[in-house]
Amino acid sequence: MDPQTNSHQEVQQPSPKETDSQTPSETLYIRNIEEKIRLTMLKRILEHLFGSYGKVIDVQARKTLRMRGQAFVVFDNLENASRALKDLQGYPLYGKPMMIQYSKSKSDIIVQRESPEEIETRKKDRKNRREMLKRTSALQPAAPKPTHKKPVPKRNVGAERKSTINEDLLPPNKVLLLQNIPQEVNADVLTQIFEAFSGFQEVRMVPGRRGIAFVEYDSDREATVAKNGTTGMSLSGNQIKVTFARKAS
């Protein structure tokens, strides 16, 4: 997380120029992540993906300007972290290759376990930095407010309302319909997202129809959980439309 602002279980962000000679750590720093992904979804996917290499005890990510497209994954031991770094280096997450390094400093969770007395020192240092930043910000002049408003384009409210009502009336189904999928997003990318939810069966792309796919689960209930967890999700700048598929009559 951002070492200047985070006050809970923070780790220091390593420089992108760090090399493999960096000191190994239980905490991995990941960058080049798709920035449009919802934070809750990103954490779930990273926990699921890295969890296949061992116990993940924390996943840290923020939407602040400094931390966009980045995250930290904390393992319970160094061996698992090293295997994950080696195997997942360059792994295409949401169509973008992950760039993974050891974090320059250990997470608070690891420090608490190995050297509890250091935690209070860390907290004091962060508090001092936050207070200094506040004092510095107070000296900066406020940006002038805009004096004009941009015209709001007209919307076809009737058509939008009709479409929304029709989708809301669809009963729960173990199969989800995905629409507005970017061309570069394939079945493997969608699988990475939706297999994080219990009961996942498969992703089926629709041949000859771009931007559409189906995701099947074991039950209506599990599909509902996945639908709620991915509503509003964006990939490569496109907001993905997730609804229940129509049941065969």
Curated annotation (Swiss-Prot):
Instruction: Kindly state a single biological-process term from the GO annotations of this entry.
Output: mRNA splicing, via spliceosome
What is the top-level taxon of the source organism? Eukaryota
Q: Does the keyword RNA-binding apply?
A: yes
Q: Where is the composition biased (Basic and acidic residues)?
A: 114-134
Task: Cite the RRM domain residue spans from the record.
Answer: 26-105, 174-247
Q: Which UniProt keywords apply?
A: mRNA processing, mRNA splicing, Nucleus, Repeat, Ribonucleoprotein, RNA-binding, Spliceosome
Under CDD domains, the record lists: RRM1_U1A_like (cd12246), RRM2_U1A_like (cd12247)
Cite a single GO MF annotation: U1 snRNA binding
Subcellular location(s): the record lists:
Nucleus, Nucleolus
Per the similarity annotation, which family is this?
Answer: Belongs to the RRM U1 A/B'' family.
Q: What does this protein do?
A: Involved in nuclear mRNA splicing.
Per UniProt, subunit arrangement is: Component of the spliceosome where it is associated with snRNP U1.
Q: What is this protein called?
A: U1 small nuclear ribonucleoprotein usp102
Native organism is Schizosaccharomyces pombe (strain 972 / ATCC 24843) (Fission yeast)
Q: What is the lineage of its organism?
A: Eukaryota, Fungi, Dikarya, Ascomycota, Taphrinomycotina
